[in-house]
């Protein structure tokens, strides 16, 4: 079993490079299935386990995929006949793979996709995806752990999402690109990753208007072709390093960070006493000697992102005073707090909110990540805690952070990754790449 070993107490200092966005590249990879002429070529592709899993999903659908990790380059060729079934073997491991359903339905008129898996955060139902497909004229059946959608011809429709779901917005938008007529989707997600997907689709020949607003209009076309595209920067990775800098009283330049994508986080960091400095080549965060408490509520974009909630609660615990975090997007997203309690965190959960009493004297402990962002929160706490912290379940971390511990170590953290045997003895320690 691999574990991160962290000796806390070191401020993070230096510059950090941020990868392409995981939450952008996965649906864009799925969108490549829509191209019946020419390959889709992507650059700034993050090297993450989720990207490899999506690559396996696409290959199982008979797309040709080439991933050059040295260049962060990914080529997807879906010009040949495709398989309509995304098997349980792949889809069950990663929730985001449900986004192949819209492209398959649009391209083939038939999609059969295993119920998705991935991080254990709430129920995350796919009902909104399916209602959208039905509105476009598809027939939906569910049996034996699979969802099946069929349509002789998708037809444009007016669709209202009960909640601005990112995945549903992406899936319906992709399905509508080849539908007959015009589709209008209201109350859509507005995330930068939605805009990035729309940009790719339009480069492929689609007619998508309004991405980034509350309403998206898609005028259907008869075919889409390959294109080239560079993946937008990962605002969640950028935000994670910003929080880590503030937590450790550090001084970190997050290279090429896009302030427009992180407004709520930057506002809260400043409110808590951090210096937020926009420079020509990025955003610099300088942590304060004493953090101030804050009250935060997660909301769909452009509100405070739920994917930053776990990391931010770790920071709130370090503030001098009482802070509150309210989670409105997903249920069961406070699971990391039980692990932080092992490090001496003091808090009280009340419904959708958690009251965080700071600052505790955080002490190192062995803790287990329950999901991707929980892993980041535990690492941030370990960077500040007295003594040694061991973080396990690193497979979650690898889904969304590339060379996380190497980047932290380059900033001055005392952190390494090692393999342990069943008796708990350390076997090897990975060197800084």
UniProtKB/Swiss-Prot annotation:
Residue positions where 2-(S-cysteinyl)pyruvic acid O-phosphothioketal is found in the record: 119
One biological process term in Gene Ontology: peptidoglycan biosynthetic process
Binding site for phosphoenolpyruvate: 22-23
Residue positions of the active site: 119
One CC-aspect GO term: cytoplasm
InterPro entries xref list: Enolpyruvate_Tfrase_dom, Enolpyruvate_Tfrase_sf, MurA_subfamily, RNA3'P_cycl/enolpyr_Trfase_a/b, UDP_GlcNAc_COvinyl_MurA
This protein's record includes keyword Cell wall biogenesis/degradation: yes
Reaction catalysis annotation: phosphoenolpyruvate + UDP-N-acetyl-alpha-D-glucosamine = UDP-N-acetyl-3-O-(1-carboxyvinyl)-alpha-D-glucosamine + phosphate
Chief location bin: cytoplasm
Free-text function comment from the UniProt entry: Cell wall formation. Adds enolpyruvyl to UDP-N-acetylglucosamine.
Protein name as annotated: UDP-N-acetylglucosamine 1-carboxyvinyltransferase 1
Organism of derivation: Latilactobacillus sakei subsp. sakei (strain 23K)
